[in-house]
Amino acid sequence: MGDERGDGRAGRFGGRIALVTGAGSGIGAAVARRLADQGAQVFAADVDGAAAATVAGELPGSHALTMDVADPAGVDRAFTAASAAHGRLDVVVHAAGVDDPAAKEWLAEALLDDRPPEVTTRLGDDAWRRVLRVNLDGTFHVLRAALRVMVPRRSGAVVTVGSSSAFDTLAGYPHYAASKAGAHALSQAVAKEAIAFGVRVNTVAPGPTQTGMAQRTPAALRRGLAGPRVRPYAAPEEIADIALFLASDDAANLVGAVLLANGGRFTV
């Protein structure tokens, strides 16, 4: 596009309105910054409203939204407010998600003790539902809200952030793997429906990435995910760049794609 940014330079997303979930930190924050740097006006949404406000405060013309993706009414309110401000949303990147620090500790303990992990028998319903509620239900809430805004205009691009764990999970991390595999399948199913209305939906599936979630991962487990034959943990900006590609006109022929970005740990 030939749109001009505020600094006079053309931006790939110049003149576009974007909403990013999980924008208070990690991949979401990197996506919000990249979009703003390339000309978009960004709504930075996060369950941590203060973190969202901090990121939005760095970005010209951007706004913060407090939004819990597990709360469908809250998601609808946020999307309504964002779309009402400009009459549309052109790009949505859904990067919000959670892990399970307790399960990671159990995995690390098993690794240090040189024994097989036993997590499923210890996993409570509350822990299972928390991960599925945010990672899978939250993806549905965001996709539904995005399509409600984009379908009437017959235009838009949605990118969901999945995980390489959907393909090859750690032994002993079943709820996270299930949530991300479900989110991938959901995104692909919605993509096949939405393209008839001019809306593209795609997914980026990162491997280990240097985020707050990774920092909470026990050191023993982090070492197990590293190695000389693979790339180091990705920077959030590397994953953000893939998300921006999927959201851009350069990816116009990609619909329902799941791009694996795991540094060579495995292929599919």
Language-model features, listed with the residues they occupy:
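Short C-terminal tail/terminal secondary-structure segment
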Residues: 2-9, 168, 255-268
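Substrate-binding pocket helix/loop in short-chain dehydrogenase/reductase
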Residues: 103-129, 214, 224
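Active-site helix of classical SDR
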Residues: 143, 179, 187
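Alpha-helical segment proximal to the catalytic Tyr-Lys
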Residues: 148, 192-193, 252
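C-terminal substrate-recognition "lid" of short-chain dehydrogenase/reductases
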Residues: 155, 235-261, 266-267
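Residue(s) in the substrate-gating loop at a strand-loop-helix junction
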Residues: 163
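Short, small/polar-rich loop/turn modules that mediate ligand/substrate recognition or access, typified
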Residues: 195, 200, 254-256
